[in-house]
Amino acid sequence: MTTPKKTAKTSGNEARELADLSEDIGIRFKYPNSERVYLQGSRDDIRVPLREIRQDDTYTAQGAEANPPIPVYDTSGVYGDPAAHIDLKQGLPHIRTAWLNERGDTEILPKLSSEYGIERAHDPKTAHLRFNQITRPRRAKSGGNVTQLHYARRGIITPEMEFVAIRERLKLDELSQKSEYAKLLKQHAGQSFGANIPTHPDQITPEFVRREIAAGRAIIPANINHPELEPMIIGRNFRVKINGNLGNSAVTSSLTEEVEKMVWSLRWGADTIMDLSTGAHIHETREWIIRNAPVPIGTVPIYQALEKTGGIAEDLTWDLFRDTLIEQAEQGVDYFTIHAGVLLRYVPMTADRLTGIVSRGGSIMAKWCLAHHRENFLYTHFDEICEIMKAYDVSFSLGDGLRPGCIADANDESQFAELHTLGELTSKAWKHDVQVMIEGPGHVPLQRVKENMTEELQHCFEAPFYTLGPLVTDIAPGYDHITSGIGAANIGWYGTAMLCYVTPKEHLGLPDKEDVRTGIITYKLAAHAADLAKGWPGAQLRDNALSKARFEFRWRDQFRLSLDPERAESFHDETLPAEGAKIAHFCSMCGPKFCSMKITQEVRDYADKQKAQRQGMEEKAVEFVKKGAKIYS
């Protein structure tokens, strides 16, 4: 292995910050009028979290009418459970350990397998930054395969599969039997573009999950060294998921900031997190994040490998990269972005592009290929990479290193040449029973977005598609969460399984916490719009509940049911801050005399009154006839 040429500098300030990591950083979330609920599986240790939003009663002339609680998908882990004990220095509970032990196909290693991992574990300069509750890593027994795809193809339903089936179902099968949800569960028919979307919640079974994984249409990213994970699924025939990025850089951000940013991302609804750190203490930062993450963690291993060479792409070697893969797999990374489709012969195709190669990983591998005039070592060593992946159940996120960086370059020869190669690599990974998803663009004008989905389905055999947006225009720096959210909603509808968020700082700088919040909310919105459009069962429940609350002027319920309750309430209170305004039958937009919903209610009340009068007159007429129709008795 190549000896690393660069040793990260330590920071006394960062050590002091780590010493202060506690609930004081605001990691326990308090969602308004919400309750954490656990759905019980077939065994005691399958407890699936969801959040129920309680609603106020509706008051009519006939009295109070109860509004039922609304269940919502919850990614917040222990941070959203008021009863949970939280200690970032101890990490999260190991909910999967018993499942892993019972399968009997893994072994606890006596020590780390990665040379760099061993070096970091014994480096006194980083002792003050290390997570101290590290356990020995787990690996498949010799010659074994421990992937969820391997089990699914053998007809085995794992606890992870049952967990995600319950999680996707969100107890809507139970609610569909209750009369109080009858109107709320009505929704428009979706257009699924050939996807096999369940038509009723009771079809979302562990067996359905197993079949989707076995077919390669879905993955459960779940490294055996991430026992803290609450399993989730990424696939075309499930809810659209979103990924949030974080990571330090050589310019800014600290280890503590990244841990806080990870927890903050969960608060707003990130389904997975990618740690894209390129600055100091990459190894230690990742350990802290994984040990405290209830969601899958992804990385781009070539970033850390490059850091080990001092930033010199030409000095990258297969041995160095292999050791980095093992280092990260033994920490518990759930999926790797691997840019194995950037082939030497594709690089010249990008010469006429307006913005060339914009992927960091893609540009690193392109530079290596040109410097050595050899084929991409990630491609030539792909089978060996698969051997590592299946020993830890790390999923592939096959990187789009030649994705377009502007709409002018969208859907060009180099982009689709790489995509077709990713399809070839998908087939190769599947021969090893390694789980795969495919990364997609990028920057694509709206009229050409669907073509990307069609190409991916055809050439990558329905492996889950994972896209960065796409951005549908290039004229809005500072607003690229919106330009990309438009493309994301569309491509999610067409079949993309996971959307990688974009923040307002895209192309401008490293995002801070508020940028992360804005990016995640934007992408939760895009994913939800896609779920509505493709007809996911129960997707419209929350919309209907919020619409009913809006019509009935239940302001607090409107805030509670929204994706960002705090912001919704703060916008309302900017003009009507008084508590009485929370029950007023108008807002500051129209005022009390011009509110369309208030007028509609008055029209309905008037119509009801007229109807009552007509009924009264009709009843009197019938009574008059029954009494002989005499005017005077």
UniProtKB/Swiss-Prot annotation:
Cofactors (names): [4Fe-4S] cluster
Biological process (GO), any one: thiamine biosynthetic process
GO CC terms: cytosol
EC number: 4.1.99.17
Pathway(s): Cofactor biosynthesis; thiamine diphosphate biosynthesis
Reactions catalysed, as given in the entry: 5-amino-1-(5-phospho-beta-D-ribosyl)imidazole + S-adenosyl-L-methionine = 4-amino-2-methyl-5-(phosphooxymethyl)pyrimidine + CO + 5'-deoxyadenosine + formate + L-methionine + 3 H(+)
Family of this protein: Belongs to the ThiC family.
Record-given protein name: Phosphomethylpyrimidine synthase
Organism: Neisseria meningitidis serogroup C / serotype 2a (strain ATCC 700532 / DSM 15464 / FAM18)
Gene designation: thiC
